[in-house]
A protein has these predicted regions:
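Extracytoplasmic beta-rich repeat domains
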Residues: 37-73, 100-116, 137-153, 176-199, ...
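Short loop/turn segments that connect beta-strands within beta-propeller blades
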Residues: 92-95, 132-135, 170-173, 215-217, ...
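Loop/turn-rich, solvent-exposed surfaces of beta-rich toroidal or solenoidal domains
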Residues: 293-300, 308-342
Length: 387
């Protein structure tokens, strides 16, 4: 009975609670630039494009600016978003209208988890807060910071904290149910990580591993390494799994920061393949290919069967790309100037380019049904319907 209940569950700053330092992507990029001793490369110039796929804009909405690692919460034709000022909103994907909107009046560090009814965020004061129908349901103090959106499923709220603990709370009352503490590392990435459900297993990214947990008690069912820490310093050894994954049935594919892309059979808990890849953003995919953006702006496609490279394009080099997302015939990436680039899934050729509000698209774009939703750093929300 309980198993069915969970089925489909479908700048360095020192932390106060552990001897773990938090490092942002910007910090890593600055350190890399300093070590290379060279100037930052100039972004590739954008060439004129003849639109080969249509992507009409459906609606827009607006939030306050967003500087934390927002992970949109998608469920049941809704998308839940949040902004720096503590605003949390659930939008109807079809119309862009507010289902509800409220303010927690406190800055947010992680969010938004949503099952379409309950939304959950973590504040900079290390509080887990749940919201339902635009009203605060409960809040609980956490012992550590969190940068990954809470995961809401099966009547529970799960939190991956910066000390690499996984915590489960009762969705109605906020009562803590269990904590699973895994071995810590000297550094943790200040970026959204990986949490999802595959069948009756909670799958979490812990350091360079995908780990399967029993959602009822937190016990470990399996671990599959996507990357092993290497290098001469803690920054080079940082291999946290980053948010933005691809899942097809029991197969889950993810990126290890600066290290690799790999796929795991989460039903059996075994590694299928892993390939070196030097990127910092999440991935996307379809039934044939896994798509990623590398640190230098190259966009790559790997075969999902074995990880071998299918194609790569350098037309967007050094444009500070977002994670990709598959939308219609295209794989779509955003850049630091608010452009959306539509590339062919077959060969990476340019199919279209759209603009938003001119601010960076560093938040992973989302697809809900046939609707592509893009959120910018200045708080603009744009919905398109690509062919």
């Amino acid at each position: 009975m309980m198993k069915r209940y969970f089925q489909g569950f479908k700048a360095l700053v020192q932390t106060k609670t552990a001897s773990t330092a938090i490092v942002s992507i910007a910090c890593v990029m600055v350190l890399a630039a300093c070590s290379s001793g060279s100037k930052r490369p100039q972004p590739a110039e954008l060439t004129a494009v003849t639109p080969l796929v249509a992507a009409p804009q459906l609606w827009t909405s607006r939030l306050a600016p967003i500087t934390f690692a927002l992970q949109p919460g998608v469920a049941n034709n809704t998308i839940a978003l949040a902004s720096d000022d503590g605003s949390v909103v659930m939008l109807d994907v079809l119309t862009g209208r507010d289902v509800w909107r409220m303010s927690l009046a406190t800055p947010i560090s992680a969010g938004v988890g949503s099952d379409g009814v309950t939304a959950a965020v973590v504040t900079k004061a290390n509080e887990l807060v749940t919201v339902r129908n635009g009203r605060e349901l409960w809040r609980q103090r956490l012992v550590s910071q969190a940068f990954t959106a809470p995961f809401v499923a099966g009547g529970r709220v799960f939190v991956l904290a910066a000390d690499r603990s996984v915590n489960a709370f009762d969705g109605e009352t906020g009562r803590k149910l269990w904590t699973q503490q895994r071995p810590n590392e000297p550094l943790v990435l200040k970026q959204g990580g990986v949490m999802l459900a595959v069948g009756d297993t909670l799958v979490v990214g812990l350091a360079g591993r995908l780990t399967g947990l029993n959602p009822l008690n937190g016990s470990v069912r399996w671990e599959a390494p996507l990357a092993t820490p290497r290098g001469i310093n803690d920054v080079e050894r940082l291999v946290d799994l980053v948010g933005g994954i691809y899942r097809e049935s029991d197969v889950v594919c993810a990126r290890a920061f600066q290290a690799s892309i790999g796929c795991v059979n989460a039903g059996r808990g075994n590694l299928l393949w892993t390939k070196p890849a030097n990127g910092v953003q999440g991935i996307s995919g379809d039934s044939r290919l896994i798509f990623g953006t590398e640190s230098d702006g190259n966009v790559i496609a790997l075969k999902i069967a074995d990880g071998e490279k299918s194609w790569t394009t350098d037309r967007l080099r050094y444009r500070s790309l977002s994670a990709p997302v598959v939308a219609g015939r295209s794989v779509v990436v955003g850049d630091s100037l608010g452009n959306l680039h539509f590339l062919s899934r077959d060969d990476g050729s340019l199919l279209n380019r759209l603009t938003t509000d001119g601010s960076a698209i560093s938040i992973n774009p989302a697809v809900v049904g046939k609707t592509l939703i893009v959120v910018t750093r200045s708080g603009g929300v744009f919905a398109f319907q690509p062919e």
